[in-house]
Amino acid sequence: MARILIVDDSPTETFRFKEILTKHGYEVLDASTGADGVTLAESALPDLILIDVVMPGVNGFQATRQITRAEKTKHIPIIIVSTKDQATDRVWGKRQGARDYLTKPVEEEALIEVIKQYLNAG
């Protein structure tokens, strides 16, 4: 069973993602801040990370950069899932090391398809 880390400061979004992911057989971890997400990524070494951009303190772009630059976690695929939908946000997310960028609200089928794509690629 693949382990997925959700990093999102919205309890509502985290709950929604947890429901979807557990329904599809994934083990789910979660963090509500970018800093906690980086720490949990380093300690739990999830198979994939879903991360929001807008969070207090360390934002999703900064956390993505830290995770993808660290030797221990650089192999973990990161998918940004955010309400920020400008092309510049997508480009910046990819430059920080994200493998993909989905815009909220994301449909369940689309989310699962992208997750499978990156888990199977590893």
State what each model feature region is.
Residues 15-23:
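Charged docking surfaces used in two-component/phosphorelay signaling
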Residues 25-32, 40:
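Short hydrophobic/Thr-rich beta-strand motif most characteristic of the beta2 strand and flanking loop
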Residues 44-50:
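Active-site beta3 strand of CheY-like receiver
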Residues 55:
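Receiver (REC) domain active-site loop signature in two-component systems and cognate sites
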Residues 99:
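Short, glycine/charged-rich "phosphate-handling" switch motifs in NTP-dependent
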Residues 106-115:
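C-terminal output helix
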